[in-house]
Amino acid sequence: MQDAPQEEDVPDVSALFPEAPPECHRTLDMVLRAGLKASFRLLPQARPRLEEIAQACDCEVDAIAQIALYKGKTSKKPYLVIASGKRTMKERALAAAIGEVLQRSNDEATMQLTGFAPGMIPPLGLTMRLPVLMDANLNRFAQIWCHAGTPNAFIRVSTALLARAISARSIKPDL
């Protein structure tokens, strides 16, 4: 296992990704601190559809991670759920994975717990560390595209290395 980069070893985000808006810097910085290699893409559309993202990033729609915040219905414990493309995570699959029914968090809770609005949550750079449930279908891809902190900014990272960096638990979404 590789040691995390030291402060002086982490490149300057704005120098490495000059096209990245400031809202993406925290995410990109955490990607670099996790030792991940990433590609960055800023799309011209303000809120691109999945098909537009796939075309611009030259990938399948299912290689785009859709990230949302859920909470336990009883415990209220928050979970970051990463789904593959247009797929949705079935409630019974989530419940089977953690032993509790989950419900999607509202916009205010999402913003408070992640630091990002719904629909643009990145996998890294959140305001707090959260348990992560990741769609096993994403493992079909060596690399996936994720939001980088704005609706039109994306990073491409290694699926396996990202899963390890965020301690994601792989689950089958359609039990």
Which stretches of residues belong to each language-model region?
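Extended, low-hydrophobicity, polar/charged segments
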Residues: 2-175
